[in-house]
UniProtKB/Swiss-Prot annotation:
InterPro entries: CobW/HypB/UreG_nucleotide-bd (IPR003495), P-loop_NTPase (IPR027417), UreG (IPR004400). This is Urease accessory protein UreG. Belongs to the SIMIBI class G3E GTPase family. UreG subfamily. Keywords: Chaperone, Cytoplasm, GTP-binding, Nickel insertion, Nucleotide-binding. The lineage of its organism: Bacteria, Pseudomonadati, Pseudomonadota, Alphaproteobacteria, Hyphomicrobiales.
Length: 203
């Protein structure tokens, strides 16, 4: 499902500390041998996430672009996605054979969504550490993303979160939309997310 503008564009959103950069790293490493992959990261005042991905050796540095959004990070992925679209256009010129571009948003609240002009598929990441009630609080990221990732499941016993409750609430809030529990530190759940992208993205 490459878009009219080139590669499949996958938006990765979620609150600060939920594990967006860790997910982006794992997806790059899982897919880079089979696909031509690039990343655009969004930070308010720095390019910290882009620099982190380079340090993690997720991809070569020419395939990672960091944009500084200023102000509210959700504006750059929703109301005015120009800065991200320009970054993707630059990657397309530099790497004409791109198959997939991951767009990692700046950390934001549960109301953040990607403009359909920017992302073909959206993944929303939440953390077990934010509390077991997060799935039932709803918001566009929880209810309307193409895939919900409930990360840091390994920490549930330490923060008093019941994964069965989170599973039940996510099922209810998302109706038929898929979700997956993950532990990015160990790579648990990554293969399911890659399979989802291959199937839904037509890769």
């Amino acid at each position: 499902m490459k878009s009219r503008n080139g590669p499949l564009r996958v938006g990765i959103g979620g609150p600060v500390g939920s594990g967006k950069t860790a997910l982006t790293e794992k997806l790059c490493k899982a897919m880079r041998d089979d696909y031509s992959v690039a990343v655009v990261t969004n930070d308010i005042y720095t390019t910290e996430d882009a620099e982190a991905l380079v340090r993690m050796q997720a991809l070569t540095s020419d395939r990672i672009v960091g944009v500084e959004t200023g102000g509210c990070p959700h504006t750059a992925i929703r109301e005015d996605a120009t800065i991200n679209l320009q970054a993707i256009a630059g990657l397309n010129r530099r790497i004409p054979d791109l198959d997939v571009v991951f767009i990692e948003s700046g950390g934001d609240n549960l109301a953040a969504t990607f403009s359909p002009d920017l992302a073909d598929i959206t993944i929303y990441v939440i953390s077990v550490c934010q509390g077991e009630e997060i799935p039932r609080k709803g918001g566009p990221g929880i209810t309307r993303s193409d895939l919900l990732v409930i990360n840091k499941k390994d920490l549930a016993p330490y923060v008093g979160a019941d994964l069965e409750v989170m599973d039940r609430d996510a099922t209810r809030m998302r109706a038929s939309r898929p979700f997956v529990f993950s532990d990015m530190k160990r790579g648990d759940g990554v293969s399911s997310i890659v399979s989802f992208l291959r199937e839904q993205g037509g890769l």
